């Protein structure tokens, strides 16, 4: 397997439309594009699939634990397929970017994101790639939890969907090793 792509979010219908599920939205859109059917894989506790795209074998992982327990499923699938951390791309919501923005980044801190914090712990490293999908910030730290656990207004959802589209548009360059070109294209929007 060439890459493991993981989308972070919270499982269940009550969370499906919340901002915190931007990673799920991104991975599901990708799965639909490459014709992959995500199915429950009990041994990893995630919805999983394999697919071929851009001449590469991809693993798709959507953890079915809550956000703060995302690391275990991603680590388990990565270990099974012997995928090194630097070949993992984690798609997640990002408070520090406005709706409509997206960024590719390797490594770094978790910035208070509990899904990334758990991934750092489970993988034993921060040296994995992140696709950060902007959801905006509510303005005050005390408002963060209700903000990420609520649905964005339609205008913001449209911007988030556009960022997901642009992100998936640069994914072939990224996966084939043209990371600078992918970042330049995505970050210039």
Swiss-Prot record:
Active site per database record: 20
Taxonomy, superkingdom: Bacteria
Marked site: Stabilizes the basic form of H active site to accept a proton: 93
Subcellular compartments: Cytoplasm
Gene3D superfamilies in alphabetical order: Peptidyl-tRNA hydrolase
Pfam family, one: Pept_tRNA_hydro
Binding site for tRNA: 15, 66, 68, 114
Cytoplasm found in the keyword field: yes
Reaction equations catalysed: an N-acyl-L-alpha-aminoacyl-tRNA + H2O = an N-acyl-L-amino acid + a tRNA + H(+)
Enzyme type, top EC level: hydrolase
Entry function: Hydrolyzes ribosome-free peptidyl-tRNAs (with 1 or more amino acids incorporated), which drop off the ribosome during protein synthesis, or as a result of ribosome stalling.
Subunit organization: Monomer.
Family: Belongs to the PTH family.
Protein name (database record): Peptidyl-tRNA hydrolase
Gene name for this UniProt entry: pth
């Amino acid at each position: 397997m060439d890459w493991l792509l993981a989308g972070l979010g919270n499982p269940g219908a009550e969370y499906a439309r919340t901002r915190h599920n931007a990673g799920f939205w991104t991975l599901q859109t990708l799965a639909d594009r490459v014709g992959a059917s995500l199915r429950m894989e009990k041994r990893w506790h995630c919805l999983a699939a394999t697919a071929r795209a851009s001449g590469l074998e991809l693993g798709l992982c959507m953890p079915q634990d809550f956000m703060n327990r995302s690391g275990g499923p991603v680590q388990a699938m990565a270990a099974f397929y012997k995928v090194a951390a630097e070949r993992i791309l984690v798609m997640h919501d990002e408070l520090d970017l406005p709706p409509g923005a997206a960024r590719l980044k390797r490594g770094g801190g978790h910035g208070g994101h509990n899904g990334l914090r758990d991934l750092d712990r489970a993988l034993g490293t921060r040296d994995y790639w992140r696709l950060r999908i902007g959801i905006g910030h509510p303005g005050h730290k005390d408002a963060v939890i209700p903000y990420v656990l609520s649905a964005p207004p339609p205008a913001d959802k449209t911007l988030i969907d556009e960022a997901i589209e642009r992100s998936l548009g640069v994914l072939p360059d990224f996966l084939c090793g043209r990371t600078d070109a992918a970042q330049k294209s995505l970050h210039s929007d």
